[in-house]
Amino acid sequence: MSHILFLVALSFVCSSCNRTPSVEEPDVLKVELKETPVSVSDFFSKVEVIPLETSDSCLLARILRVRVSGDTTYILTQDYPTFRHITLMAFDKKGNYLRSIGRVGQGPGEYSQVYDAVISEQRNRVYMLSPFGSMYTYRLDGSFIDRKILPQKMNFQEIGLTPDGDLLTWSAQNKDDGACIMRLDADSAKLINEF
């Protein structure tokens, strides 16, 4: 009987003993960052202030994006005081207002909301991205071409151009597979690949 009690006690002691594997501490690299003052002239050879035209048709309230293409500066801006409507305005290199591209509404060529725009001079196009899964295409003169539904309806935030003219869109809401960047054909808005 004492042997049985001894074996039970021994098995209890053995089962309660755990070996924890040794964990090696990772190497810690210490990086010392030195702040170095940088001058604007380190990046630009010339800085020129260009006052933009101010009239009732082209008042800027909150600037969201600035895109420069050729001699034209495109500014994506929200209206004041509601900050609900977003407009893309074009100015020449002297700051003169040229036109607005697209507008808020329910009709053809009108959008409910856009978050970003990109300009392709090679294609004579302006692509405006709606967060609701649509892309609006206009000519550089502001005339409407079409509206395309994007492959997946996601919370689209930004749009850009690749060197070969395809479009890249970024979404804040990842799909289940983690992809949040889509590469699209600029003409058809068909999905090429996603990352």
Feature annotation, model-predicted:
Residues 68-71, 119-123, 161-164:
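Residue-level detector of Asp-centered blade-edge/turn motifs that repeat once per structural unit
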Residues 92-94, 139-143, 185-188:
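Short loop/turn segments that connect beta-strands within beta-propeller blades
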Residues 113, 131-178:
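Asp-box/WD-like beta-propeller blade repeats and closely related beta-sheet repeat scaffolds
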Residues 13-16:
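C-terminal motif of bacterial Sec signal peptides marking the signal peptidase cleavage site
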Residues 21-51:
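Blade/loop signatures of beta-propeller domains
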Residues 86-89, 134-136, 180-182:
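A short loop-to-beta-strand structural motif that recurs across blades of beta-propeller domains
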Residues 53-57, 62, 91, 96-123:
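Blade-loop segments of beta-propeller domains
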Residues 48-84:
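Beta-strand-rich domains and repeat architectures in extracellular enzymes and scaffolds
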